[in-house]
Design a protein with these regions (language model features):
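Donor nucleotide-activated moiety binding/catalytic core segment of transferases
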Residues: 32-48, 209-251
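Conserved catalytic-core segment of nucleotide-activated headgroup transferases in glycan assembly
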Residues: 1-5, 126, 134-217, 289, ...
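Tryptophan-centric aromatic hotspots in well-structured domains and transmembrane helices
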Residues: 10-13, 71-75, 172, 176, ...
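Short, charged/polar "capping" segments at the starts of alpha-helices
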Residues: 16-23, 120-122, 180, 210-216, ...
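C-terminal amphipathic helix plus adjacent low-complexity
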Residues: 150, 292-339
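Catalytic binding pocket for nucleotide-activated donors in carbohydrate/polymer assembly enzymes
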Residues: 218, 248-315
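A donor-sugar binding/catalytic signature common to diverse glycosyltransferases
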Residues: 51-65, 70-75, 229-274
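Active-site and donor-binding regions of nucleotide-sugar-utilizing enzymes
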Residues: 1-149
Length: 339
């Protein structure tokens, strides 16, 4: 926004773990999204001309927008392997009051930003919206991956932090599971991974911020546990191999066209309880394993495949490094029309 000379009065409510360079963004007022600031959040939701959200916010259910106000859902991922919204399997277990609130929140999304036609179809089913709600301008969060000099800088920076030297970096970033709020259990056999790969690789572990586990016990010469609050976009340039399961990370990492493996040890259970997208096994751009032994063998025998490039092209169709610019142009137009 600032680069384009567009600096309207902007209020940003954020999770307290996120830090910003407030000096560079002097036109933005940053407020932690906590109980103490809840009344301010409600005030600005009711008085702003343009509202950007990136997740489900129950507060929207209590807001009645005036004519001309537009709430735009940016979402926090440019693709989805697990179901959400009305597609989430757990919806059937929620109360009538919950479902009424979900409906009220989703109806406030006048536009939803998408990076692909595939994700647009998922949003239509998940939020019960139609084609006119879709803003096909690309996903702003992917713009950084098209800045080659920045990505090269990040790769060098993080490899130095990892003391990678001549070793390659494997990132294991499992998705969040609802039962991990109390205590998480990592199924991967880290000893077996170390025996198999310690000569040529480092294993970087990146867990969801909500996961509770004694990570200090996992730090070895082979395993590096990254702080939960480190943003993934900071890390991906330094990664040579990604291991995940049902998270949205592959949709961004595919832009690098580097190998992705899916350690989906609880696939049937997860699909039953939470729900995976249809044809999950056909859509993902890499092999599935359900045991560490299978995973090790797959990594050892990996081959170059065109699947990754095709996957990235399909799911990042509208994301070309200029999505943020198009978003700013769109917001500027909305603000001018609202005068």
């Amino acid at each position: 926004m600032k680069k384009m000379g567009y600096t309207p009065n902007t209020i940003c409510f954020h999770t307290e773990r996120v830090q910003f360079n407030t000096k560079e963004l002097d036109f933005v007022r940053f407020l932690p999204n906590n109980l103490a600031n809840k009344w301010k959040l409600m005030f600005y939701l009711n008085t702003s001309k343009v509202i950007l959200v990136d997740n489900y916010y129950p507060e929207l259910a209590a807001v009645s927008f005036k004519d001309g106000v537009e709430c735009i859902q940016l979402w926090h991922a440019n693709g989805a392997l697990k179901q959400f919204g009305w597609e989430d399997n757990s919806i059937s277990e929620r109360s009538d009051a919950d479902r009424k609130r979900f409906k009220a929140v989703y109806e406030h999304f006048l536009k939803v930003v998408v990076g692909s036609d595939e994700m647009g179809e998922i949003f239509k089913r998940s939020f019960l919206i139609n084609e006119s709600h879709l803003l096909k301008i690309g996903v702003p969060r992917t713009d950084v991956y098209f800045e080659e000099s920045l990505q090269q800088q990040k790769r060098i920076e993080w490899r130095n932090k990892f003391h990678a030297e001549n070793k390659k970096v494997i990132l294991y970033a499992p998705t969040f599971r609802d039962n991990e709020l109390a205590e998480a259990k990592l199924v991967m056999d880290f000893n077996a991974m170390e025996r198999a790969f310690s000569e040529d690789y480092l294993l970087v572990l990146k867990l969801h911020p909500a996961v509770k586990i004694d990570v200090q016990s996992l730090n070895t010469d082979f395993i590096i546990n990254v702080d939960k609050n480190v943003a993934l976009e900071e890390l991906l340039a330094a990664v040579d191999i990604l291991i995940t399961d049902y998270s949205s990370i592959p949709f961004e990492f595919a832009l690098f066209e580097r190998p992705i493996f899916f350690f989906s040890y609880d696939m049937e259970k997860y699909d039953k309880e939470r729900g995976l997208i249809k044809n999950y096994q056909e859509i993902i751009p890499g092999p599935i394993s359900q045991t560490t032994a299978e995973l090790i063998e797959q990594i050892k025998t990996k081959t170059t495949s065109e699947t990754l490039a095709l996957f990235s092209k399909k799911w990042n169709k509208y994301s070309d490094g200029h999505a943020s610019e198009r978003m700013v142009v769109y917001m500027k137009q909305l603000m001018e029309e609202a005068k």
